[in-house]
């Protein structure tokens, strides 16, 4: 019985982490590209992938979905794990 409770707690911790990461998929680009290069809209992503042509549009923020978790998502993930751990210890 004790082993089953541990497995269930670990499962819900991982599940809460995945849910938090999947809901925080908006990436904000401070220097977007003037044109869209496939899935890359950030200037950094364009230069990183050797798409160096084109200029930048200033004072424009581009939002788009990406399968990469942002720092905030990772931070919320660790917070949810800590909360679930503290709650399970009571």
From Swiss-Prot:
The keyword Disulfide bond applies. Residues 1-23 form the signal peptide. GO terms for biological process: defense response to fungus; killing of cells of another organism. GO terms for cellular component: extracellular region. It is found in: Secreted. Keywords: Antimicrobial, Disulfide bond, Fungicide, Plant defense, Secreted, Signal. It comes from the Eukaryota. Pfam families: Defensin. Disulfide bonds join 33-56, 42-77. The keyword Nuclease does not apply. Belongs to the DEFL family. This is Putative defensin-like protein 64.
